[in-house]
From Swiss-Prot:
UniProt KW Repeat keyword: yes
Entry EC no(s): 2.3.1.89
Function: Catalyzes the transfer of an acetyl group from acetyl-CoA to tetrahydrodipicolinate.
Transmembrane segments: none
Listed pathway(s): Amino-acid biosynthesis; L-lysine biosynthesis via DAP pathway; LL-2,6-diaminopimelate from (S)-tetrahydrodipicolinate (acetylase route): step 1/3
Keywords: Acyltransferase, Amino-acid biosynthesis, Diaminopimelate biosynthesis, Lysine biosynthesis, Repeat, Transferase
Gene source species: Enterococcus faecalis (strain ATCC 700802 / V583)
Matches recorded under NCBIfam families: DapD_Ac
Protein name: 2,3,4,5-tetrahydropyridine-2,6-dicarboxylate N-acetyltransferase
Length: 233
């Protein structure tokens, strides 16, 4: 998705405050609206719906509802989380992935990683623990994005270029790649680097701001090897 498509999608999306409600009472006597999904055994039940629908329902039936607990984790949210069930990748618990994210075959998304709308993860790429892919950040195939790394997102302003990480790139832990930067194929970004300009292919960059320190050699390749065993499903 380009920035304008994302902006249109967010702008047109119905903003919802989704809740889960566990309740008990004289539920056999209650009429549930069609806008609320209900699992009810007459004395106790569970509701799922938008707070805009659930709140007036609870207030209208307070004489028949003895008690309830509301669970909620967002307010006026426009973008749901991605449905992960049929994605051909390994996605660990605790990863936060918004709808409209693309994940390639045999990619690995570790716990705590955050992928915003429009982000792309190529086949066989690992996004390590706590890494953040901002809106429209694009990562190619067979890359490793280290723990705690941030690939800056660009949705607003829509004319700005996104971060692009080409194939077979390795980025160390806690690096930052700023908006509009392209990291060339086979490059290595050292841990803690702050990348503010494009990185040539097959080079190693390090520092703040990141600078080229050498060309990729056999020693570097051995230290940054991508292991297919970690990507098996």
């Amino acid at each position: 998705m380009d920035a304008y498509e994302i902006i249109q999608y967010i702008g047109d999306a119905k903003k919802q405050t989704l809740v889960k409600v566990t309740l008990k009472g004289q539920l056999k006597e209650v009429t549930f609206p069609e806008t609320i999904k209900v699992f009810n055994n007459c004395k106790t039940g569970t509701l799922f719906g938008d707070w805009a629908d659930v709140k007036p329902f609870l207030e209208a039936n307070k004489e028949k509802i003895e008690d309830y607990v509301v669970e909620n984790d967002a307010r006026n949210s426009a973008i749901p989380f991605l449905d992960l069930k049929d994605i051909n990748a390994r996605i660990e618990p605790g990863a936060l992935i918004r709808e409209k994210v693309e994940i390639g075959d045999q990619a690995v998304i570790m716990m705590g990683a955050i992928l915003n709308i429009g982000a792309v993860v190529g086949a066989g790429t690992m996004i390590d623990m706590g890494a953040v892919l901002g809106g429209r950040a694009t990562v190619g195939k067979h890359c490793h994005i280290g723990a705690g790394t941030v690939l800056a997102g660009v949705i607003e302003p829509p004319s700005a270029a996104p971060v692009v990480i080409e194939n077979e790139v390795v980025i160390g832990a806690n690096a930052v790649v700023l908006e509009g930067v392209r990291v060339g194929e086979g490059a290595v970004v050292a841990a803690g680097a702050v990348v503010v300009e494009d990185v040539p292919a097959h080079t190693v960059v390090a520092g703040v701001p990141a600078k080229v320190i050498k060309q990729i050699d056999d020693k570097t390749k051995s230290k940054t090897e991508i292991l297919e065993e970690l990507r098996k499903l």
